[in-house]
Amino acid sequence: MPLHTDDVFAPSSKARLTTRDLGRFPEDTLFHRIARVVCGAGCLPRKELFEAWEVARRVRRRFRGGRVVDLCAGHGLLGQIMLLLDDSSPEVMLADPSLPPSSVTLSRALAAEWPRLDGRVTFREEPLDQIELRKDDVVASVHACGTLTDRVIEKAVAARARLAVMPCCHNLDVSDTGALGGWLDGPLAVDVVRASRLRAMGWQVVTQTIPREITPHNRLLIAELPRVAEEPSSPTARRR
């Protein structure tokens, strides 16, 4: 997907997309269709559209099916794009301690364009600790600030759920840099430690980035437990 990188329409802008921007998305691609719906809703910062799309399509290349759980979801576009990209997921939960009122506006606009979303999007305005995860979930979170990313990782690990996070706002006074500050800048060291800890626990880790012209906080950490081989048949079955 080509990015608009000119000064007038930078993908990193926090300006809201509105109907004035509809002409910038004329194609019949899924991204342009989503963008036109977002423009019509008139409530989403431009950078969130590009961030959600770039993260969702990378995660869906790795993880199919399962309930999608978008934690610290904000407007919830990430989770809903993931549902559009893979209709085998039964539903998406959008969870945030403080959901913006316009998250409902955006969800209704998306469901009007894609009726199959209707009834499959659940909002949970609750603290992160109160959200229950399941083993078959795909847990995603974009820019959960500081140690919130660590709490998202911890919850996914506890549930053995598939995980994708794109951290931001690293708190170097609290987060573990693994004594790597002499070689790496602080935020990168924190993310290296996060990935290394998951690997040490036996998780398969994939590290990627989205285009930096969208956000400087562009490191994407994707992880899952290896698939366990099927248990051998019972001794009785083997004797047969």
Could you describe each region identified by the protein language model?
Residues 1-240:
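Class I S-adenosyl-L-methionine
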